[in-house]
Amino acid sequence: MEAKQRTRHRDGEERRLVAAADGGAEEYDPWTAWLYKPHTISVLLVGACLLIWASGALDPEGASYHSSATSIKRGVWAMIAVFLAYCTLQAPSTILIRPHPAVWRLVHGLAVVYLVALAFLLFQNRDDARQFMKHLYPDLGVELPERSYGADCRLYVPENPKNKFINIYETLFDEFVVAHILGWWGKAVMIRNQLLLWVLSIGFELMELTFRHMLPNFNECWWDSIILDILICNWFGIWAGMHTVRYFDGKTYEWVGLSRQPSIMGKVKRSLSQFTPAQWDKDQWYPFMGPLRFVQVLFLCVVFMTVELNTFFLKFCLWIPPRNPLVVYRLILWWLIAIPTIREYNSYLQNSKPVKKVGAFCWLSLAICIVELLICMKFGHGLFHDPMPTWLIIFWSSVGVALVVFLLAWSWRNHLKYQRKRL
């Protein structure tokens, strides 16, 4: 009986949260209800005042002088700020409501700005695009040496006077080690499926092997690729991420409003818990449910690996060093975009009703991935002189043919089963 009451309470709480996210601010706690009421006119007036102050619209003539280049930069940033403010207030809400629906509307606006910036970059030539990056970070626009991790694969280097295990030491303390662990933790929290995570982990190592003739950065030693990447960094990130998933999956989501917390400490904990999920969905991908679902899940994996490959090719083509903040900003933005994208795509797959279109974030993610790929292809002309090895062409051609035959056989088998049931 108590379990049924808890279930009804949780279901009612979820309905209340969804209704409030759709604009029912009166359903929220009295202390925080004002955060969910529309403040469009107030923000418009405050924004107008900020524009007056920043632009000097009411200043006397000649009171504030800026060069043409500075004025253009200020104008572009103001244009982006106005657009993001509009998106935060007016963009469509997503299925995510924590910490606030406006946060995900802002992420939606950032994704659109990034897509538009990529479209602009696509219409430049390679040299102009590299020099354009100086406007984002002054140190860019300079050709960089690309590090090769496979130049010396010895585990023990006896002639090195400082460290006999210098190769292992430099690999372990490379910035990509931390990036691998954090990246796979983030993927595990988003995807929540161990099988897909290992497919992505091994698949990306195959991508590095495939494109090592193009990017020196992908030329890794066998122990770096198999032991350090897959069995240590990726495994630890997936392990930590799946433990995080199980932690949130085991919690009971019965939220009590801030005003109903009996103590100051309770109010602080409730405020901090606003940055945790309102409820936890078990994403069931079922890749072997049928040929169509297999292709849909495989498509998700292909997009994931393409986005990761774009990171390295964009750095190479645009001369962006690995430690430049722009690399980190892009990865953070992609992570923020991917969170609602995965939720939308999984809801699209699990919806039993015939859904005609995917969510806005799914569309934006695919569009950004395509434009990034087009930039890599356009700016990569003439940079990669070594042809793909013949054995790689044969290998991937065989994989493609085997995949097509497998899907056709699977589809034919399902068709025969359906025909037998009809008889």
Swiss-Prot record:
Catalysed reaction equations from the record: a CDP-1,2-diacyl-sn-glycerol + L-serine = a 1,2-diacyl-sn-glycero-3-phospho-L-serine + CMP + H(+)
Class in the EC hierarchy, top level: transferase
Family: Belongs to the CDP-alcohol phosphatidyltransferase class-I family.
Cellular localization per UniProt: Endoplasmic reticulum membrane
GO BP annotations listed: phosphatidylethanolamine biosynthetic process; phosphatidylserine biosynthetic process
Spans traversing the lipid bilayer: 38-58, 77-97, 103-123, 195-215, 222-242, 294-314, 319-339, 359-379, 390-410
GO cellular component: endoplasmic reticulum membrane
Superkingdom of the source species: Eukaryota
Pathway terms, separated by semicolons: Phospholipid metabolism; phosphatidylethanolamine biosynthesis; phosphatidylethanolamine from CDP-diacylglycerol: step 1/2
Enzyme Commission no: 2.7.8.8
Biological classification of the source: Eukaryota, Viridiplantae, Streptophyta, Embryophyta, Tracheophyta
Pfam families (UniProt xref): PSS
The name this protein goes by in its record: CDP-diacylglycerol--serine O-phosphatidyltransferase 2
Membrane topology according to the record: Multi-pass membrane protein
Statement: the UniProt record of this protein carries the keyword Cytoplasm: no
Organism for this UniProt entry: Oryza sativa subsp. japonica
Swiss-Prot/TrEMBL keywords: Endoplasmic reticulum, Lipid biosynthesis, Lipid metabolism, Membrane, Phospholipid biosynthesis, Phospholipid metabolism, Transferase, Transmembrane, Transmembrane helix
